[in-house]
């Protein structure tokens, strides 16, 4: 009579477990596909992360104005400029976080219904930060409660000067590219649908005109815009240096592949993850995630980081870049690393 050992695993179960362990081990050691081919300029080259000025530094000057970007450049000449683009009725790409003018200016209406020429001729002021629930116009103030005029900007890059001492004129993407010909610029397409696709087309035209493929990042939270980036990348219509980041769902896709150990099968050609430190209670800034992205040659850029402790945590974990509304605050911390 055979004796059974109580609790002994069935051979089939053992085999299944061994197969699963072997599969995960194989996935771990398989070389990760390179999402971005060649040297990725969005990855840091030393210990310190790259400073990214969110909307030019939205806490120090009115965001998405040329003056804000001048201020950011005065803090760090290597700064990455982050901005938002919308296309006007007459086909000009202007910088603005919302698709309407209501929050940031002294006029109302969707940007797609305004001509850029009218914005300039009417001297529309982009120096406001109006509350959505109020009809009252509120001029931008810094964190100390001070109203900031363009004339308050002290340091202009060589060869450049102020446009208007009192108001913040509409800023175009082309102006930004010309003002900072050496800096990387991250552009988020804010409009969706056909209007957003028109904005992408015009941005591509400008990038081609100025041969700026190696310094423009294309971004969007709109899934249809991200799908267009993927299509352009896979179709060969853009050079290999074309850089883009995923939409929210695109980022979720990468994180899901990473969490389940399936990132060896991740094939989207993104150059950078532009993500928060946490989303839906899930931490996204661990050393492990950052290192895993690096194996795919994907840079990790975190937004919008205004707390000093968060900045230090990201530095410790090895983030490639930190996006902030306060360039001076982050620069002070980064300078402290060098001492």
Feature map (PLM): residue ranges:
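Phosphate-group recognition and catalysis centered on beta-loop-alpha active-site segments
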Residues: 2-339
